[in-house]
Amino acid sequence: MEFNYNIEGGNFSRAGTASSEVKKILKQLNVNPAVLKRIVVALYEAEVNVVAHAYEGTMQVSIDPTVITVVIIPDIDLAMQEGYSTASPEVREMGFGAGMGLPNMQKNCDKLTIESKVNEGTKVTMTTFF
């Protein structure tokens, strides 16, 4: 099963919409609740990163395994450090941009791969086995 979700940068009112839809699908497939929670946390973090840091992104989900593609921070090593954030003061005032997005994504999936090209974007692939 494959699904594509467009994510609009800066639109915090819709942040979490794609991850919520994926959660519903996985619940219908009777995915183990503990695994489901990990997947949804990782998806939500990826989605919020797009909203907070990019103009737009695409979440491509393939069930078994789950794969997600989004646009994120170009400096991957720095971005993986807990607490690092490029979020604007406005984003931080809304409660986002704590610098935990990528570390939380890594903790909540079985495999995380990040490919990035400056001025072109970043592809994040998360795989979780259930």
Task: Provide a role label for each language-model segment.
Residues 40-44, 48:
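Short acidic amphipathic alpha-helix that forms the conserved interface helix of the HATPase_c
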Residues 1-41:
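Bergerat-fold GHKL ATPase/HATPase_c domain
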